[in-house]
Amino acid sequence: MKKIKSLTALLLALSICAVTACSSQPADSSSATESASATESSTDSTTASGASSETSSKESSDTSTKPEKPVTDFTTYVSNTVVSTGNNFYIEKAENITYRAYLPVEQYGELEYKFFFTNTVDSTYTKGKIAFVGKSGGSYTISNATVADGGTGVEDEITNRTPVTFGGKETKEVAADESYWSDPVTMNIPEGHYMVWEWTVSGEGIPCNKMSSLTSTASSADGETFKFCDEIPLPQIIGAKRDVKHTVAAIGDSITQGCQTEQMKYEFWASKISTQLGSDVAFFNCGLGWARASDAASNENWLSRVSQYDTVIVAFGTNDIVSGKYGGKKSSAEEIDEYLDAIVSYLTEKGCDVILFNAPPQDFKKTNEGVRTALNEKIPAIAEKYGAKFFDFSALLSTEDEPGKAVYGGHPNGEGGTVVADAFVKQFGSLFE
């Protein structure tokens, strides 16, 4: 497995933009778990996992030798929402469509914000027919963009609309594969209120976030009559200049993103970890539905964003087992092990503390469960190899008698989110004090 190329001027010169319009394409609400169940042989029964519960307590050999992270907009304007806003889908065409999203913030009050955009797809969606890792976006126009106080929910009046500008202008022409930041904007979000992001875009081939129903998202052709939209272009980072003592990022699939948990309740494990750590720890959720470890291992653009954070949670495996690398077939345990090795190697070289999760239970049948079991036996060794930390995600979401059974669902529900968050903070909470 070839290691990811070193990041050079990318972090200082990134200027990508992502915009996507809700198209008429039918929503694909099927989950990775459902697909897995449909594709495996029905003649084989689920086998016990026996995944290793050993944790790697090995620290980096000398933390003083870690490379110092350069000061960039990524480190100055850190994430201020637990909602994942990356690109895992692609809107074919939008004509003056206005998109609106309600975003919960981690720290309330008056803060200076900047927003980062990338006009490239981060990860593969299902088999990659429409969107795949590294797919280039087309050109599009931003007519206007604003942030506002959304009140305590969608029934409240939206107030304090504030323009977001780009190079001093309210409009912007975005080129294919461009990446960029907005200008700074100061915004006050009162305690318990949502930030509302809204913009109007036109163009073709706009990367977007799909499975965005964790929060209220909508589109409008006239800027007034909004309807639910599950394919929505958003900034990839809702960045705020915050005085935090630690930064944490999580990169993974729909389980990290929080899919199939109750809308606007933020009960998924990543959100609950963020809540328990408190607002003086910035949490950046980079989970994307259908993402694979092979996507992250081949996409420095996506991986480089999380590498700006002090600690990075890496949580992949399910979709590599179910669907495999884009353009390929289902991945073997050995192949997934190589992808994870490349990811952890890259992140440790960038000075990140890495917490590596194993693959969670999915009620797989025999073939896929065998791959998951073999993979989970390998993962602690990756953590040990790089001085990373290991978290037995799988054991928390199953039982000792039935290690392959997803007790809280293939996409863990709120109860499962609490179990994971409690165990995570108990094991690693002192690292963030």
Residue locations for each model-derived region?
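Conserved SGNH/GDSL esterase-like catalytic core that processes O-acyl groups on lipids
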Residues: 245-250, 255-341, 363-365, 373, ...
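Bacterial N-terminal signal peptides that target proteins for export
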Residues: 1-10
